[in-house]
């Protein structure tokens, strides 16, 4: 206790000032408390800073993660099962379609529907000309009088005619099933002089075989002649290709020929032409008689480019050149090693007999499907329709590879999902690849012939969908395809859509089913549905407009200074006039109508499959509501349906003024560009353009048969000062400000007047529909239907006879074909117009 009291006393004494006896403890403690307060505040700030820093780090990491997540979504596959099995194109499942003319970009060639195919093809040269013109890939610059399939059934055989100025080549192929690898096939190439040729031409045919990343090729050479190629690959097993001797057409006796061959490394298939060209040498002698010796051009040796990438995998290219004077024929045989029960060789009379049987079957099937003879078409027009159809189905290709894609989250383009694509193409010379909005039109015709092919094509396209529901609108899958495309068009952007025309084909499939769903069809539609749903949802989330039930195409050109009217490539109608100043306030009537069709088809599919359909039914009812459609898109001034946006009617292209500093002279390279001049500021209004876009509520049969707006459309269609011509409906009214106006200094009018067959098909189809619907305009529609159908058939056939081709578009003032050719993509819909099958 004493120690405790002493301790307390000492504590009390320590709190008393020795001089004045006052308690000074508070004065001594104040600084300590302030320090503690400051220390506490500092700790709070430090803690808060640490928390903020941690939150910032977490947010930064989350932002990076999310950006990376969004960046990778463009190349993330759709989670549903593929529509087509990975081996759906294999010889085990579809042996009859394993081999085919799946190389539309070359005049003649075959490959398999596989990832790494052995590739075969044909080149030719007319000898003793001032220039060496090597023909291989389909080129408009070759200026051939005509070329194309006359008959092709998509599976078994094809007959093609290629006209040069002095001779005609006929290329025929046929297949014979057997074994486990797709069986055998035979080519027959026939050369005949043109009647106008001054003498029978000497022609070199160059047959080639190339491996494309897989397989072994072994040449068999006798003297200077490559007589055969044997080989093997994982998908073909063992095989042999034999080059037979050229024969006289009449006697069938062997003809004199000179031979050359080439064996060369080939890094990629797009290099084949260049390799052959660089190997040509004019030192070889053609001497059918000792008195007539002439030097001709033949393949010799090929020296690869020095310092090529050592890591490059080189494939093998083998070329067999035979030089003969026309007329003659020559056969090439492919024989599968697994075809063990071959009773005879598939050549000569055996091949001829089988070819004739296929031709008769083709004629009979074509007549049974399209009934053109029954409709009164003469034989020459029936042959025309057969050729048009054959070029569509014979122009189908099989591609494998990756597109290059980019989203707003990717700084650089990325390789897209690797995969195959079995598809028709718009043009063998200019567009030898798949286009999304073209394909729906292509399959309207092909499905009439073979629904199995069309179902597979649709499956291939939808299997290219990513997790977002986006499908690249242009499929440029390999180096061979990329070699045909300008660099600025190679990269596909995932905010950009394309008209979902595959719904047109699916609509036709549902109509053909007529409510009778087979087990096979049900399985197919069930596989389609998850991807169709995602695709449909993608449009409704990425392409919506500023108002409910409105839509807007993304991807319009942003450099408004150089374009008279910024293009809308994504709509498929490229330079068709839209709002002059692109903005988020735009409403596009054509896209709204496409989504009306899509909603209807989705409703019908869900009904067939017994799935919930109310959402699609509600959307269809909203989009097909004529009063709401008119509220959003009817222009009282134009008396037509129209786009809406930030638009000026006073624009033109003018030479820009180049200011030259005082004391300096203008340089020669300072050419004044054509730039856009806006004389009146834009405002939100309807776009003053009457043309194809204005017709979409009619084209897709959304208008009620008794709608007064239908009468307006029919009257304006028939007006020669607007859309009507003796050759078909022009794309833009003559009264529209941008009719036949260039869009830039270098871009001629494209969808600003010329006649397009795909939209005219939709017009004829709609007229046929309204001519069968009870209403005040039924008779008017029937009259226009007959007149327009006749005009289209007459002009397109006339141009085919005169030029040898179907064309991308037709001049609205003369009817002449123009643009790329041959264009047997959607221009082939003329066959359905002839057959009145809509």
Predicted ranges, named:
Residues 2-386, 430, 604, 769-773:
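Terminal accessory carbohydrate-recognition/targeting modules of carbohydrate-active enzymes
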Residues 192-194, 588-628, 702-704, 741-774:
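Long, repeat-rich segments with strong aromatic
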Residues 376-380, 394, 399-444:
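Asp/Glu-centered strand-loop micro-motifs enriched in Gly/Pro and often flanked by an aromatic residue
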Residues 380-405, 449, 461, 465-471, ...:
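Active-site acid/base region of carbohydrate-active enzymes
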Residues 418-428, 472-495, 559-587, 656-658, ...:
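Acidic/His metal-coordination segments adjacent to aromatic residues that form catalytic metal sites
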Residues 429-563, 569, 592, 596, ...:
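Aromatic-rich carbohydrate-recognition surfaces in CAZymes
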Residues 536-556, 593-705, 786-825:
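Catalytic cores of carbohydrate-active enzymes
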Residues 567-585, 650-723, 750-784, 817-838:
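Aromatic (Trp/Tyr) and acidic
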